[in-house]
């Protein structure tokens, strides 16, 4: 029997082998106890402020929306220690692991950002760390592989399946099933079996809480929309959580359109998938008519995931949030534009959200609106990927 509701409407649940149920229930109990323990909360807050660098700024863009009446703000998770929003919830889960008496951490990573965040938290808190990463992603994200190793983590390349994030997730779950007594599985996104979607949201929701307060301070009102990229969905749910009960604020989660939805090479299960069970949860996923998981695709390794967190599935189903998609090309254009106009190099993941915000601003230039984009990470990890693409296309002017 769970202590918290494992479902968001019809989505969520705990669809895992029986052997993992005790580990998930132990984790849920530890989380429920910890969130009501002032000492745990104080330690988490201290790490967020003194180690990670919170609160992060809300930056008004100066040049990007010239010619429009949009005021576009960036929530600067790229300035967080570790380079992305991932550090927030990793510190929370690592503290939980120590509280449960675990000595080892297992993690999966796509772009490598969650792996880096996990490695730094383990180094700080004295935990052993092993990270599963798709072999294809290891190639795409060599700087992050080196960072993880530098901080003492063991990086295990996964060659099965499509050699990407979904395969790394499967291997990490297998490892946890065999070693859950000594190890905690530090899941990197707001997906997977209960209680992970709830835990990750709670350890990421300061993004939206800060953004709301900062927006009131600067604009004396709520934003018209908050916009975030969606792979598994942790940075988006962290931004959305504090705005869900504010009906005047549009919640926009941007999925990766890859080479275009019509090409079939994308990662947009909310817009173009169907319901099913995957990775321990009931959600939307990319599957064929036989229920086989289809390969997702995105230029951004961190969005290359064939499903999505159950709370996003629920928000989509009830019409509270909208989930458009942005192609590789649109994201790459936004990546270059932010760098040239504001001197900020965003992660390719975050560039998807930025691209959609720019569409909103430019499609209605006379509309006075306040938009907040969650700039979920910085683009250092992506410069080699992008340089190769621009070189092939001859597009770096």
UniProtKB/Swiss-Prot annotation:
Q: Which domain of life is it from?
A: Bacteria
Lyase listed as a keyword:
yes
- Provide the alphabetized UniProt keywords: Amino-acid biosynthesis, Aromatic amino acid biosynthesis, Lyase, Pyridoxal phosphate, Tryptophan biosynthesis
GO MF: tryptophan synthase activity
For this record, the Gene Ontology CC terms, alphabetical, are: cytoplasm
Q: List the cofactors.
A: pyridoxal 5'-phosphate
What is the designated name of this protein? Tryptophan synthase beta chain
Give the organism the record lists.
Aeromonas hydrophila subsp. hydrophila (strain ATCC 7966 / DSM 30187 / BCRC 13018 / CCUG 14551 / JCM 1027 / KCTC 2358 / NCIMB 9240 / NCTC 8049)
- Which lineage ranks, top first, belong to the organism behind this chain? Bacteria, Pseudomonadati, Pseudomonadota, Gammaproteobacteria, Aeromonadales
